[in-house]
Amino acid sequence: MAQGEVLEFEEIVRTRQDALLRTPPGLVPDPVDAQDLLQTALARTYGRWEGIADKRLADAYLRRVMINTRTEWWRARKLEEVPTEQLPDARVEDSTEQHADRALLMDAMKVLAPKQRSVVVLRHWEQMSTEETAAALGMSAGTVKSTLHRALARLREELETRDLDARALEREERERCAAA
């Protein structure tokens, strides 16, 4: 690779580092896996940097590599048990309530199919447009919209179920205390 292209790649990584660091925790629950995912995506992208015609789409290319790598990992680990208690660390500036909400949402996202989860992460956490998300995932804008609609409906359903379960437990506890 020519020195100019190496510098160009380094500059993109340096200037887009905050955005790049936000994507992996939405794709994999373990913070260590998230770091590995980003590292792998950067290494793979670096190896193919000369072949990328439009360098302005580097973010989308890197996200696509992360999604593909995550999919490869899931296929390889398909038969292994996935721990549900591991959640990514929240940023220090989050309040306790925001941290709890984020942890609840991350846990609830585990019910989504990988494609649905990818669409939710790119559209809502990365705040990509429908068209950008479609390009990053290699699908049509209509598919992004319908997948997002189904994913959000499934998340609402999951969160409502959890809320009803929590209320039932609170009611049982009050009844137990009143009877004692």
UniProtKB/Swiss-Prot annotation:
A Gene Ontology term for the protein's cellular component: cytoplasm
Taxonomic superkingdom: Bacteria
Keyword Magnesium part of the UniProt annotation: no
Xref: SUPFAM superfamilies: Sigma2 domain of RNA polymerase sigma factors (SSF88946), Sigma3 and sigma4 domains of RNA polymerase sigma factors (SSF88659)
One GO term of the biological process aspect: DNA-templated transcription initiation
Keyword field contains Transcription regulation: yes
Keyword terms of this UniProt record: Cytoplasm, DNA-binding, Sigma factor, Transcription, Transcription regulation
Record's signal peptide: none
Location relative to the cell: Cytoplasm
Gene Ontology molecular functions: DNA binding; sigma factor activity
Motif (Polymerase core binding): 36-49
Annotated DNA-binding residue span(s): 130-149
CDD domains: Sigma70_r4
InterPro entries: RNA_pol_sigma-70-like, RNA_pol_sigma-70_dom, RNA_pol_sigma-E_actinobac, RNA_pol_sigma70_ECF_CS, RNA_pol_sigma70_r4_t2, RNA_pol_sigma_r2, RNA_pol_sigma_r3/r4-like, WH-like_DNA-bd_sf
Family that this chain belongs to: Belongs to the sigma-70 factor family. ECF subfamily.
Protein's job: Sigma factors are initiation factors that promote the attachment of RNA polymerase to specific initiation sites and are then released. This sigma factor is required for the synthesis of the antibiotic actinomycin.
Protein name: RNA polymerase sigma-E factor
Source species: Streptomyces antibioticus
Gene: sigE
